[in-house]
Amino acid sequence: MPHRGWTIPAGHPNYEVNNTYEIEEDIFLLSMGPHMHYRGKAMRYELEYPDGEREVLLWVPDYDFNWQFLYEYEEPKFIPEGSKMHMSWWFDNSEANRFNPDPSQDVVYGPETTDEMANARIYYAPTTPRGLVVGEQIPDDIINRAREEDMIRRERADLFDPAADDFSWLTEDSP
C-alpha cells in the first residue's frame, strides 16, 4: 500500500506521514514489510478494530534502508472486516542523517533511492475460500471479480491508469 502526495521539507529531522486503509473482509494477516529509502527513520503498523480497540502490530523504531525485512507471523493473525490499518512513517531529511543524499532539498515520493517512499506491504489470505483449486481452470466470474477489485484498489491508491493498464495482457494462459 503505497502512500503518495506528501513532501518532506528540506532539513526536517522527524517528518511524519500517515495513511489509513480499511479492511474490507475478514482476513488472516500473514506478514508485513515496511519500505522507505535513505531518509526512512521509523515505521509503525497499528490496527484499529471495529470496536475501537487499537493494537500496534509492528513497530520498527530504527529503520535501516539496507536491512529491509518481511515480518512474518508464526500463526496467521485474524483481522475482522471493518478494521482499519493505520500506518505511520517517520523521515529524517536533516544533515544529521548520514545517509541523506541532499538535506537541502525537499523530497517527494518517487522510484529512485534519492526520492522517498512510504510503502506498507501487507500479505494476507481471505478467510473465505475463493473456490480455486490448483490445476483446475479459474472460473470467469472469479477472474472478472478479481479484475474489478484490483481496479478499485488501484484507484483508491491512485495507481491505476486505464490508458496504461487495460488488462489486455491477462489471459487464461498467463503465468
Regions found by a protein language model. Give the residues of each.
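His-enriched metal-coordination microenvironments in redox/metal-binding proteins
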Residues: 1-131
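Activation corresponds to long, low-complexity, non-globular regions
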Residues: 132-175
